[in-house]
């Protein structure tokens, strides 16, 4: 049945969608990635008259049932590689790395590929070597990514990529939601700690999950555990073990979905390892992070060739405190230190955000302007 739905999508996008309405195509692997596009989509709809297409590989993606006349939604999964190879549009927007490095290839047609980041991490340690080689434009989050990509181009003679000083729309959405919370400065409610690690090997949940939750609950902290979606998919036993251990504890909550940011907004402190959520949480809620000192999340063994310290590494001592796993028995002291010095950390976080994030509050407009400029240039070329 799913495959039939894919064939119908292919037919609809090729033969039933006017060329002007497939000039721009967004692609998403999973429904959760819509949160990285929504600001850009809203800004684009206000400046681009024609509808555009949104392709998802998640059959349960709510966008497939959208009634928005400005978006044509399609489902492609197994047939996606074929679609990608022959897609004919002006601009293709995606948050998936490694285009043209594996089974998803650039189109045989002259398509301009725009990359949108789904994390604020640096480009050279958490991503594979060459992950951004085959995009025409990259909407950079901050100056650190521009420096890294420029340095990478110098070392390897990568093709000419437009590095757009855009910003990070998801961060702005988190900050806007947090700013509207009436309880954001309420000290009377129980302290809440969010544990949200990465899914890499040696992550916090795998090594110290039950021990960490038990130590926090014994100190009367409310605890929310938010496993990475890849952890739920690859290591479901970790979540199951936590649920079984603390199911009778009303102060424990296991959050299996990342559809909302509610847990981030309600947490007084975030505990993580090398996950990109640390930057989103700190810069979005202006609250500190407690980092667990576990091995780095390295997907590119050559990252040191750039001689640039990854942003997520340089920020660890600035956005909070780094704690060794052997110090879990002192977890309450670390959390209380962060909470008691919240204003000092807030001032520092706001300063660092202004120094390291482009166009805070206006990134979606910048991204939409870039796409519209590409469409304008393409139209001029076609008319000549």
Give residue ranges: language-model regions:
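Catalytic donor nucleotide-activated moiety binding site of glycosyltransferases and closely related
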Residues: 55-67, 218-254
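A nucleotide-sugar donor-handling region in carbohydrate enzymes
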Residues: 2-9, 131-205, 229-232, 329, ...
């Amino acid at each position: 049945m799913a495959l039939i739905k894919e064939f119908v999508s292919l037919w609809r996008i090729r033969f039933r969608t006017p060329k002007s309405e497939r000039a721009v195509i967004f692609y998403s692997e999973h429904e959760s990635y819509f949160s990285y596009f929504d600001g850009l989509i809203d800004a684009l709809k206000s400046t681009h008259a024609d509808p555009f297409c949104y392709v998802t590989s998640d059959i349960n993606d709510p966008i497939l049932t959208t009634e928005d006349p400005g978006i044509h939604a399609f489902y492609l999964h197994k047939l996606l590689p074929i679609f990608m190879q022959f897609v004919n549009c002006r601009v293709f927007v995606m948050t998936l790395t490694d285009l043209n490095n594996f089974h998803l290839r650039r189109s045989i047609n002259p398509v301009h590929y725009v990359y949108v980041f789904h994390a604020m991490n640096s480009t050279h340690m958490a991503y594979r070597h060459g992950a951004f080689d085959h995009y025409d434009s990259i909407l950079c989050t901050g100056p650190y990514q521009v420096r890294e990509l420029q340095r990478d181009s110098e070392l390897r003679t990568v093709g000419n990529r437009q590095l757009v000083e855009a910003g990070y729309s998801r961060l702005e959405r988190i900050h806007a939601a947090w700013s509207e919370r009436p309880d954001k400065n309420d000290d009377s409610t129980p302290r809440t700690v969010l544990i949200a690690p990465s899914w890499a090997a040696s992550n916090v949940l795998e090594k110290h999950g039950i021990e960490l939750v038990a130590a926090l609950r014994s100190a009367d902290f409310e605890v929310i555990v938010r496993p990475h979606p890849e952890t739920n998919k690859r290591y479901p036993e970790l979540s199951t073990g936590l649920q079984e251990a603390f199911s009778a504890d009303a102060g424990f909550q296991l959050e299996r979905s990342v559809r909302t940011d509610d847990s981030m907004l309600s947490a007084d402190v975030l505990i993580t390892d090398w996950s990109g959520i640390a930057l989103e949480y700190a810069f979005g809620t202006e609250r500190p992070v407690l980092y667990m000192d576990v091995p780095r999340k390295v997907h590119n063994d050559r990252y040191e060739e750039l001689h640039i310290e990854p942003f997520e590494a340089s920020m660890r001592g600035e956005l909070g405190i780094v704690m060794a796993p052997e110090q879990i028995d002192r977890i309450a002291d670390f959390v209380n230190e962060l909470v008691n010095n919240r204003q000092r950390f807030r001032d520092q976080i706001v300063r660092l955000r202004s120094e390291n994030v482009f166009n805070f509050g206006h990134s979606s407009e910048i991204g939409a302007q870039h796409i519209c400029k590409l469409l304008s240039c393409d139209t001029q070329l076609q008319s000549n």
